[in-house]
Every structure is written in structure tokens, then in C-alpha cells.
């Protein structure tokens, strides 16, 4: 599991702690999004973030970054990070198995958004979902950008917490990102990533 390959197997042996199988036939099955999407979002209330992780995993996110942002109501100290990561990873693993994913998305925590700037070279596209763009009626940037996505492209999508992204945080990526609105309505922090993933799935999987 987690190498994006599916095999028809025959059980060869079962013990108390493992199952040995013989590989019989490789299966032509792919349940992964054509593009690699990392969801970077500000910390939000625990139940909402866990729901986001579950649903975004079902919708095809490849990895998650939880970030303590300027307007995050929830704060996470170092003593709690390890236990939180363990719980989040368990939720992600269960959602991946339930939705027949071929990979288990990863998750990490960063104490501020500046640390993400050091990783921008890892991505082909960086998109920032900004509610002010929606208020101003911006409707085309997201559509135009996702139409450019090619198979295996790596996409980083950044979402704010309940209070949204600050102008300072937006400015960190001013020269490297595309700021997008997600339709004419203002979405909740836990809903916006799901909207984006659904749009990507529709464009790259259903429209082909």
C-alpha cells in the first residue's frame, strides 16, 4: 500500500502478526488525481480540521501542511504537535483506505507561513485562496490556472484560518503565486479546500 500499484494476490501464509502473499497479477487501477495537490491551511478548530482532512483525502489531496497563521484562533504548542500529527495521520489513513486511495497522504505542521516560502521551488504552481478576491468579483484566475495543469504537476494551495489570511501573509508569495477567488460566495475555512479539490477533479478527471 502507498506505492500506487495494485496487485491481485493470493494468501500464502498467515501468522499472528503478518500475512504473506504471492503476487499474481498487476491491476490497471488508478484512483489518484492526475496532479499532486498539497493543501496548506491555517489552523482551525480541531473538529473542523479533522473533518477537512478526512474529506480532502477522499477528494484526492496528496499531502497536508497545517500552519499557525496570524489570524489562527487555535494555537498549537510543540508539546502537542507530535500527538496531533499522530491523530491527524490516523484520520488520513482511514479516509485513504475507505476511498480506495493508492497512497496515504502525508501531513506536517509549521509554526508560521514564512517557513513555507523556503519550499516553493518544490511546486509547479502556488495558488492562494483569498476571500478579498471573491468579494471583488474575481472569478477567472482559478479556472484559467487549473486548465494549465499537466499530469504530475505539483500544486500548492494555501488557505487561511477562520479569520482569513493577512495582507502580510499574502505578500510573502506576491512574486511566486497566483491569488484566486473561489466563486462569488465566501466559503468557510474547512470548505474552501474541498471546493478547490472538487474543481480540480472535475477539470482534470471528468473533463479529461
Region roles according to the model:
Residues 1-28:
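N-terminal positively charged helical leader segments and presequences
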Residues 2, 43, 110, 130-132, ...:
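Fold-independent oxyanion-binding glycine-rich loops
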Residues 4-6, 16-18, 32-36, 59, ...:
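Short connector loops at helix/strand junctions that flank enzyme active sites
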Residues 14-18, 28-31, 78-79, 118-125, ...:
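Short, glycine- and charge-enriched coil/turn segments that flank and shape catalytic ligand pockets
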Residues 28-128:
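RNA substrate-binding interface of SAM-dependent RNA methyltransferases
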Residues 73-74, 136, 189, 196:
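Generic structural signal for helix capping and beta-alpha/helix-loop junctions
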Residues 126-164, 168-170, 177-181:
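Active-site/ligand-binding-proximal alpha/beta "capping" segment
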Residues 166-208:
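Structured adenosyl-cofactor binding patch, chiefly the S-adenosyl-L-methionine
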Amino acid at each position: 500500500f502507498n506505492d500506487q500499484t495494485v496487485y491481485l494476490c493470493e494468501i500464502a501464509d498467515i501468522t499472528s502478526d503478518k500475512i504473506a502473499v504471492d503476487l499474481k497479477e498487476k491491476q490497471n487501477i488508478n484512483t489518484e488525481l492526475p496532479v499532486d495537490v498539497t493543501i496548506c491551511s491555517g489552523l482551525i478548530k480541531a473538529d473542523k480540521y479533522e473533518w477537512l482532512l478526512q474529506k480532502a483525502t477522499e477528494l484526492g489531496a496528496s499531502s497536508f501542511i497545517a500552519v499557525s497563521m496570524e489570524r489562527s484562533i487555535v494555537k498549537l504548542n510543540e508539546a502537542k504537535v507530535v500527538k496531533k500529527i499522530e491523530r491527524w495521520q490516523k484520520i488520513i489513513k482511514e479516509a485513504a483506505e475507505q476511498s480506495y486511495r493508492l497512497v496515504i497522504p502525508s501531513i506536517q505542521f509549521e509554526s508560521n507561513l514564512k517557513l513555507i516560502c523556503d519550499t516553493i521551488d518544490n511546486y509547479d504552481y502556488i495558488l492562494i485562496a483569498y476571500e478579498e478576491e471573491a468579494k471583488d468579483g474575481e472569478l477567472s484566475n482559478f479556472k484559467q490556472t487549473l486548465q494549465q495543469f499537466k499530469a504530475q504537476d505539483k500544486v500548492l494551495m494555501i488557505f487561511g484560518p477562520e479569520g482569513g489570511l493577512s495582507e502580510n501573509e499574502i505578500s510573502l508569495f506576491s512574486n511566486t503565486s497566483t491569488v484566486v477567488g473561489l466563486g462569488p460566495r465566501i466559503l468557510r475555512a474547512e470548505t474552501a479546500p474541498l471546493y478547490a479539490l472538487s474543481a480540480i477533479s472535475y477539470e482534470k478527471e471528468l473533463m479529461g
